[in-house]
Amino acid sequence: DQAAALHAPRWNDPALRHLSWLDRTTPAAAAATSAIVASLYPGFVERFGPGLAPEVLDGLERGMARIGDWWRGVPGAATVLHGDLRLDNLLLGEGSDDIWTVDWQTVVVGNGVADAAYFVGGNLLPEVRRAHEDDLVRHYHQALVDRGVADLTWDECWARYRHGTWHGVYLCVAAAMLVEQTERGDLMFSTDIDRHVRHALDLDAFDVFDRFDESTIPGASRG
């Protein structure tokens, strides 16, 4: 509900296209961002690769080989997303609806459903995610619809969600190499990369590199 409350008000708002400093989906921004993450990858795999399961390392290698295609194909600038939506960045009050989101340094304009994929993929144990993922994403989709997002079908929402699984992979690679290295940080990033890559593997999300471009994504509008 909180993610939908963030994403729905500015969903497919044309004014967002003028916020170039937030839009990472333009060709220039996509090329620059993917190049930066790719340049950090050798150091990341040197530090964390030996501790990864073979199937996770293989999935990571395959995903990194297509990072440029992923950024170029991010579904159109649909809404404002937090970019790092995880439990560390949530303050929980006494009531079930008392939730505050903090740490907005990664806010961008783009595929809002990536926030949902990042949250579910990174915060839940893989076995818990697999058991509840469909229900959680359907709840998120319905919450968007209830808040006025029209024309975003369930199938399109799920497609964008699968695309968003790679958001966590690439963010993890970049963040791990850009922040000060600590024992706690290394443990967190090794857990994160394992969960996010397994998420992409579980959903067989390798076809998304060829699936999206701005000419083929139907825009979701607010009713």
Where are these regions (language model features)?
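ATP-dependent phospho-/nucleotidyl transfer catalytic cores
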Residues: D1-H82, E94, A200, D210-R211, ...
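Generic recognition of stable, solvent-exposed alpha-helical segments in well-folded globular domains
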Residues: D1, S39, V80, L85, ...
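All-alpha amphipathic helical-bundle segments outside canonical DNA-binding/catalytic cores
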Residues: V149-T165
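Active-site activation/catalytic loop segments of kinase-like enzymes and analogous catalytic loops
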Residues: T106, G112-V149, T165-L187
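ATP/Mg2+ or Mg2+-diphosphate-binding catalytic cores
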Residues: H167-G223
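Catalytic activation segment of kinase domains across protein kinase-like and atypical kinase folds
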Residues: R86-G122
